[in-house]
Amino acid sequence: ISCSLVGSEMCIRDRSWKKSCSGFQSSKEALLMWKKYKTTLILTTLISLFPMVIGLLLWNRMPDTIATHFGTNNVPNGWSSKTMAVIGIPLLLAALQIFTAGFTFSDPKRQNIGPKMIRLVLWIIPVTSLIICCSIYANAVGIAVDIGFVSNGIVGLLFILIGNYMPKCKQNYTTGIKVPWTLHSQENWNRTHRLAGWVWIIGGVAMIVNSFLQLEWILFLTIAALVLIPIGYSFLLFKKGI
């Protein structure tokens, strides 16, 4: 009995040691990711903050309350203080940029994401921040900018870029169609993402077309299709044993 207890204790210690080593290795790999993309992360975070500089230069020309959200036909339906629009929004986007990077670098399957997708993830927020914030500031100082055209166009291009990459995307917990059936079957993941790639590209084209039409139902239908079609297809594959 004594030998059995000692053996059990040694087994538990061995498992704990392996778990600790695994956690240490994962933390080490995440730290290496931070170091590898440090320059890109610093650059993209600064770009996320750059609209703040532009806003401060235009500070005296902008009203105290600024339209920061627009509905169809460029009709403002959301307002923020000048301080929030110029300082708060860029700061929030910069914080979101750092959080997104940390979440991506901490993915247990980070090695499957690939450098191209990581760079795409790191550049989404800064580019969006720069274009959208500058469009908001332009409207605030009386320069007419079609926010609906700009936002639909950006989203459309983003969908096309993501759709182009999806078929090459390997299993991970950060990007792609992350449902139980894709995460537990490599074949299910591969087939789902081949279909999802085309769906997202077509959805991107639809959004670019909608930048001219600016119809809400096209926006909602496109987003619903991008989410539901790949998930539904993945579930059907699962029911077939794939």
Residue ranges and their predicted role:
Residues 78-93, 146-162:
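Alpha-helical transmembrane segments
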Residues 43, 87-92, 119-126, 190-201:
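Select subsegments of transmembrane alpha-helices in polytopic membrane proteins
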Residues 1-14:
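Single conserved hydrophobic/aromatic residue that forms the stacking wall/gate
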Residues 173-240:
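Terminal transmembrane helical module of multi-pass membrane proteins
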Residues 100-149:
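Ordered, amphipathic secondary-structure segments that act as subunit-interaction surfaces
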Residues 57-58, 95-106, 161-176:
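Membrane-water interface of transmembrane alpha-helices
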Residues 55-87, 175-184:
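Active-site and channel-lining beta-strand-loop segments
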